[in-house]
Each structure stands twice: as C-alpha cells, then as structure tokens.
A protein has these predicted regions:
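Two-component system phosphorelay core
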Residues: 1-131
C-alpha cells in the first residue's frame, strides 16, 4: 500500500465524531466500543494474516471499517477501507505488508481514544470569578 495512505494528522477527529453521533455522550459510547475493538482486533488480524487465513482478518477489518468513518481521520478510514476490500483479491503476504503500514495509526487512534475517554470522565471544574 502506498505510504501516502498512512495518515499524517491526528487519527481521532472529535468534532467529526460529535457531528456524526449527535452528542458528546453518544460519541463516548461509540468510542468505548471502538476502544475495546482496537485493543482486540489488530493482534487477531495480524495472526490470521500470518497464518494465511484472510477471511477472519477481512471480517475484523470490515467491523473496524464500519465505525472508523464516524470519528477517525479520513485518511485512516480510507486506508482501512482499501485494505478490507483488498482482502478479497490479494494474497496474505501483500495484506500483511499493508496492515503493517496501517497498524501504527490504529495504535495512535487507540491512544487518542484512551486520552479522550479519560479527559471526558474527569469532573468538570468551574473557574470562580476572582474579582
């Protein structure tokens, strides 16, 4: 996969997510599910591809492809979408290399989701007027 498909910008787009989901609380719920998926799915995808078992990898990529457009950068969502489609036409060795290119961005997205969820769980502080 050409490296120009690997996103260079932040992977999590909170404004896009809130617009897609309708509210910060709805986005939070989706991000909690995505967080679990992004923890579990990439290692399973890598193992399946390494074993030459493309179908399970494609199914997991299909799931990720379904939610990324809601809150991820366009570049990352596009890259995963292309990889998922290529699961029906390309050999495992090709897919392994392409997934290896995208995996750091998925890890970055996971980290950004974790940070966002941690910030959103903090109690809101009001600043007292110091007059």
């Amino acid at each position: 996969m050409p490296s120009n498909l690997v996103p260079q910008e932040p992977c999590l787009d909170v404004e896009r997510g809130i617009a897609a989901m309708g509210s910060p609380s709805a986005l939070r719920l989706v991000l909690q599910v995505a967080y679990t998926s992004l923890q579990q799915d990439p290692p399973v995808i890598a193992q399946a591809l390494a074993a030459g078992d493309i179908q399970p990898a494609g199914k997991r990529l299909h799931g990720i492809k379904g939610y990324l457009p809601l809150f991820a950068s366009e570049a990352l969502a596009h890259g995963i979408s292309l990889l998922e489609r290529r699961c029906s036409t390309e050999p495992a060795d090709t897919l392994i290399a392409e997934f290896r290119e995208l995996r750091p961005s998925l890890a970055q997205l996971l980290s950004q989701i974790s940070s966002y969820l941690a910030l959103e769980s903090l109690p809101r502080q009001t600043i007292a007027d110091e007059r």
